[in-house]
Amino acid sequence: MKTGFNDATAMKRSNLALDLQFCEKYNYDYIEIRLDMLQEYLKTHTMDDLKLFFAKSHLKPYALNSIENINFCDEKQWKKMLELFVFACKMAKELQNPYIVVVPTMGDDMKNKTYKEVFDDSVRVLKELSDIAKPYGVKLAFEPIGDPRWCVRSMKQAWEIVKEVDRDDVGVVVDAFNLYMYNKLEDMDDIKEVPLEKIFVFHIDDSEDIPLDTLDHCHRMFPGDGVIKLKELIQLLKDKGYTEIASVEIFRPEYWEMDVEEVIRLGYEKTKKVITM
């Protein structure tokens, strides 16, 4: 597998320019760029600056993060989401960035949606977004979020949706923490049902050992520092033939307060150690 860094991991004290500098220094293969950080970068840099960096570097862009709350939008929400999505498509094309991560909707009211309502809406929306993305040559990586407030939580549910969409440019994100957050990865076998070519992105992260009903994204940890069965998950992916990105994505306030270079260095070293076990 190849190493990747998601901008979220050091975002409170960092920026895209710093992430690029240190990811290159510590020999990451890929970076996942956050759209908000890209927009901030473009206030003081140009796209040509960014394209020139990637042209000269071994570091390459992999997935833009993320288009969120795609389900059950009203007209105003849909318009706002589409504006960001089209921006992401344009940026992806210019940067030769192959994927955009898309995320289901979060809200307490999502708990009241039926399985069929979520399925039907997700299929419809992903097809519409796929139609928009196709001319730009970018693929959509649909990410289930394990927290009960999100409407698509499990790999089984996400894969059923993506399978029904049946587009070459729509696949899934395997995020270790999100799958653990759903049911402690007891459904790991569900990943076996997803064809290799439909696994677009792998987010590697770990978790504190606390009850699921209090677990939140702030409890993410560096790979190998927590209780997720990463060795088994990675072996499963390797057995399927997966050789692409293992991208460290963490939303831990403690890491956000650390020195940016230290976070990026540790992310590389710990990810590399886990994926080569």
List each model region and its residues.
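Active-site acidic/histidine proton-transfer and metal-coordination neighborhood
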Residues: N15-A17, A55-K56, C73-G171
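Histidine-acidic metal/acid-base catalytic patches
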Residues: M1-G4, T9-N27, Q96, V152-V174, ...
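N-terminal substrate-binding region of glycoside hydrolase catalytic domains
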Residues: F22, Y26-L42, N65-I70
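Active-site-proximal loop/turn and secondary-structure-junction residues that shape catalytic pockets
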Residues: T9-M11, L35-M37, I67-I70, P104-D108, ...
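Glycine-rich, proline-tolerant flexible connector loops at the mouths of alpha/beta enzymes
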Residues: E32-F54, M106-M110
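Alpha-helix N-cap and loop-to-helix initiation/capping positions
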Residues: Y41-H45, D49, K76-L84, K113-R124, ...
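Conserved beta-strand positions in the central sheet of alpha/beta enzyme cores
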Residues: E32, A63, V101, A141, ...
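Catalytic-core regions built around general acid/base machinery
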Residues: H45-S57, V125-I132, D190, V194, ...
